[in-house]
Amino acid sequence: VSRWYELCDSAGIYVMDEADCETHGLRGTLTSTPDWNAAFLDRAVRMAERDKNHPSIIFWSLGNESGFGANHAAMAGWLHTFDPTRLVHYEGAQTPYQPAKGLSEKDFDETDPACVDVMSRFYPRVKAEYLNPGVPEGSDKERAENARWEHLLDIAMRKNDNRPVLTSEYAHCMGNALGNFKEYWEEIYSHPRMAGGFIWDWVDQGIYAPGTNHVLYGGDFGDKPNLKAFCLNGVVFSDRSVSAKYQEVKHTYAPVWITQKGDEIWVKNHHSHLSLEDFSCQYQVTKNGALVQEGELKMPSVQPGDSARLCSLHDFKTYNNTDCRLNLAVISQQGVEVGREQIALSDDLYEAGRKLAADAMKRYKSSRRLVTLSTAELLARNFSVIPQFF
């Protein structure tokens, strides 16, 4: 852990240091019991004493999924007294003190207790209309557990509370995940109180079978009970090779965003302290995948948090009836890519695509749950293939 914090100190990565405290299924029982006070407090004291000299650590966390009670309040009080320079976080602070006879929606304190300095949530929703699932049906306990499905922006816009808002767990990376990741960050950047979030989690926790490339997980060892593949929820694979999710995270977390506004290309500087005057922007124009033009654009001196016009689409030569694309990459003085985008320079390619008759598709292979179709090259817009299984 200390080596990781040293690397964060060197690279300027903001860190939340979390106490090793999780009681999970017991919820608030232990934190509301005086007999456990010393054990809870010990976790906070050891963490702060061990890591107090790391400048990358900007706030402490009281733990994870342990309900909330007097013992957590004691941890927060000690940390505030020991180190008044750092904030104290705990997502579980919104849960009830004592869930002895089950939970109901009214048990959740939407305003969050005063002993924490951050309003924190698991998996809040974003505003985009198509990303708003309904609260699931179920028992009062199940509905209460999902009462945290608040809209992220609504929390940040509360007028009676000006604390920063954090998603201490979000963007669950199981399977082909992160489909709405960019929408999350468009919303996070839209309000100054939004502080970001922590993806669950970094690496698939599978184990390779000796001498094979087959990943084993729950149940593959004869272990019962198990959670099957639920441990495979990382941004990277078990061998730390990158996944498509990794590419999405890299693109969205980039400190420089490149966007198209009509015929113009703009850059947004998401750095906290750096202007873009010492950065460069390299470009390539491709025609049907082949490089036909490349060079470097003058990067405007964009201050932290600001946007500026980079160039116009008319600055680049285009070719009719071809797949013509503009690739842009913002590069630091150290040669590190900090932003990338690809923009289509020709829309007529798709308009020229012919409509393919349904009977031109040949069924190649089928089963009850899968149909594989083979066709000629298909150029079309707004189409779908709907297999008929019955």
Residue positions per predicted region:
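Substrate-binding/catalytic cleft of secreted carbohydrate-active enzymes
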Residues: 1-226, 231-232
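Carbohydrate-binding surfaces of carbohydrate-active enzymes
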Residues: 187-390
